[in-house]
């Protein structure tokens, strides 16, 4: 039996934005989109790190507006499909209509792992507008496999044509992925995707576990570009999939060159697993908290490690960075210091 084909979903120009405070410009987007398209990357996701409509003081003002980002990428890619992400509460139906008008083929609607209900209206709008609608569950480690499967069933019922779970905190080991993807693929009859982060150095291994459990779409970023320890590394994932015989349609040499370009032009340095990224994975806290935690901990004279442990105890979610000062207050009241 031949290994199944795997669709690689390149999130470099969306999830990578977290690493540069959403400051990618049109020239950077254009150059990478051309390289990805040339390499045969089937899907390229573009946007503010938190999705369309999310540019704000709370989660970061984008250097480039949504319309410019999407139009620039669309014009640079005659072959690859263009995807974007939206979070209900940030993006509106108006944002969706604008994104699809600017050439988006796939819209992912993301929600906390136990709150699939909030995706219903948006998934329906996307289908009505003629784009492919996908449902995403964030912070998926906070839900048991059967709960994730039930939430994915709801999204499929709302119109999702694929479902994806994010290891938002980079906390999974392969057996965690196997249990969750197996439960989901058993419960739904649409493609299942996995989005890994590399806090524990397991992103590629976890992605392989996902495929073996039935996932057919894997997310990745060039050089792992992303917050903290970064995402599944695109060019490494393609190479490993190739070694295992999984067709991807991607030219390995050209995607490696695209990753070289990304390192030179998109990021100050490739992501690494430092102690802060490690503890955020262990604590189950989204990697986007890294920079604000480091800054706040330094000002307060407390250990970033302890801040992450406290945030993990509180089960914080992306967008709740305003809880960092309160976590630090708790630590200082307990007499915690570096």
Curated annotation (Swiss-Prot):
Protein name: 4-hydroxy-2-oxovalerate aldolase
Stored InterPro entries: 2-IPM_HCS-like (IPR050073), 4OH_2_O-val_aldolase (IPR017629), Aldolase_TIM (IPR013785), DmpG_comm (IPR012425), DRE_TIM_HOA (IPR035685), PYR_CT (IPR000891)
Binding site for Mn(2+): 15, 195, 197
UniProt similarity note: Belongs to the 4-hydroxy-2-oxovalerate aldolase family.
Molecular function in Gene Ontology: 2-isopropylmalate synthase activity; 4-hydroxy-2-oxovalerate aldolase activity; manganese ion binding
Biological source species: Streptomyces coelicolor (strain ATCC BAA-471 / A3(2) / M145)
GO biological process: catabolic process; L-leucine biosynthetic process
Residues of the Pyruvate carboxyltransferase domain: 6-256
Transmembrane segments: none
